[in-house]
């Protein structure tokens, strides 16, 4: 028999110690990984609930197991809230991750070996947009587009040329490291010109879209996927959205279950429903606007200090720092900043001479620092400290000095109050 007051501490001290150390790391480090954020206590509470015990293969009202009457209510609420939040007619809240949501779209719309056109990983795309190390580049014939060398923005003329030349069955719009506004309609027009599906992955900007601060692709694309964490600030998971199309909805549902997954994670779906309600509530638009403002302040400060920001700035929550002209690798920059309690991730940049394991850039994002209360003043100061480290990357005294400042800033702005 289990009791609600059972504790990990005292039973599994090894796990508990690692958990406590991670709590301390999150409190004492500034988090600038663009795909990370801090969920609300409500979201975490749902994920630690007894819902984790329930198997519920199928969909609300059409389950393969009994005893699903209450989890049906939860999943339907998550579906309805997702549709309201993004103006969709269809929503599937079951994907365990963004990559699994993307895999379901591929499975629903394509046959193995068919051609897809997606953004190059080195130019800001995602593994699942056609990278050769991903299912998307192994099972399907992937063609890649990139950024204009002069503007650092998506080269729509190249997209149109590649689409005409290769006749893909599906075009993927979306990114994991692109800082400008994507012209969804331009992609729609290109897809229509060759009779291709338009699939948008808005995982990184879903929170901004929900707040009305970034163009919504749902009315334009055939299908849209997103994660539920990142800017959306919910649990780690995936979501598929679409306009009214009964045949497409059936294909997508079947591609998620039974083709791609078995039982849904009902505790995570409950957390998604809570996250969607939070996004529909007061203060959410202001939060997302601050995310953008902080990113712009950081990008501007980097440029003032002589650093190259890919695409020349940002319109969302992230940007890429190109370190090629500084003679610094992303790997070394990541490690040095880590010693200063600043967490970033190394990232490939356009025309990167380094391997993906080394890189010549950093990806920087502001959702997490905004969640813990950082404003423009803190964002500018933090950027200056990062520049101090990168300007003298081997100077451990500089790193120690910056770490002290970071610890002080973190103490004043706790992750959870």
From Swiss-Prot:
Name of the molecule in the record: Serine hydroxymethyltransferase 4
Quaternary structure, from the entry: Homodimer.
Gene Ontology annotations of biological process type: glycine biosynthetic process from serine; tetrahydrofolate interconversion
CDD domains from the UniProt entry: SHMT (cd00378)
InterPro entries, A to Z: PyrdxlP-dep_Trfase (IPR015424), PyrdxlP-dep_Trfase_major (IPR015421), PyrdxlP-dep_Trfase_small (IPR015422), Ser_HO-MeTrfase (IPR001085), Ser_HO-MeTrfase-like (IPR049943), Ser_HO-MeTrfase_PLP_BS (IPR019798), SHMT-like_dom (IPR039429)
Pathway this chain belongs to: One-carbon metabolism; tetrahydrofolate interconversion; Amino-acid biosynthesis; glycine biosynthesis; glycine from L-serine: step 1/1
Stored HAMAP family: SHMT
GO CC term, one of those recorded: cytosol
Alphabetical keyword list: Amino-acid biosynthesis, Cytoplasm, One-carbon metabolism, Pyridoxal phosphate, Transferase
Organism: Colwellia psychrerythraea (strain 34H / ATCC BAA-681) (Vibrio psychroerythus)
Functional summary from the UniProt entry: Catalyzes the reversible interconversion of serine and glycine with tetrahydrofolate (THF) serving as the one-carbon carrier. This reaction serves as the major source of one-carbon groups required for the biosynthesis of purines, thymidylate, methionine, and other important biomolecules. Also exhibits THF-independent aldolase activity toward beta-hydroxyamino acids, producing glycine and aldehydes, via a retro-aldol mechanism.
Catalyzed reactions: (6R)-5,10-methylene-5,6,7,8-tetrahydrofolate + glycine + H2O = (6S)-5,6,7,8-tetrahydrofolate + L-serine
Site feature Plays an important role in substrate specificity, where: 229
Keyword match Amino-acid biosynthesis: yes
Protein family: Belongs to the SHMT family.
Cell location: Cytoplasm
Binding site for (6S)-5,6,7,8-tetrahydrofolate: 121, 125-127, 355-357
Enzyme Commission numbers on file: 2.1.2.1
GO molecular function: glycine hydroxymethyltransferase activity; pyridoxal phosphate binding
SUPFAM superfamilies for this protein: PLP-dependent transferases
Pfam families (alphabetical): SHMT
Modified residues (N6-(pyridoxal phosphate)lysine): 230
Cofactors named for this entry: pyridoxal 5'-phosphate
Gene that specifies this protein: glyA4
Enzyme class: transferase
NCBIfam families: PRK00011.1 (NF000586)
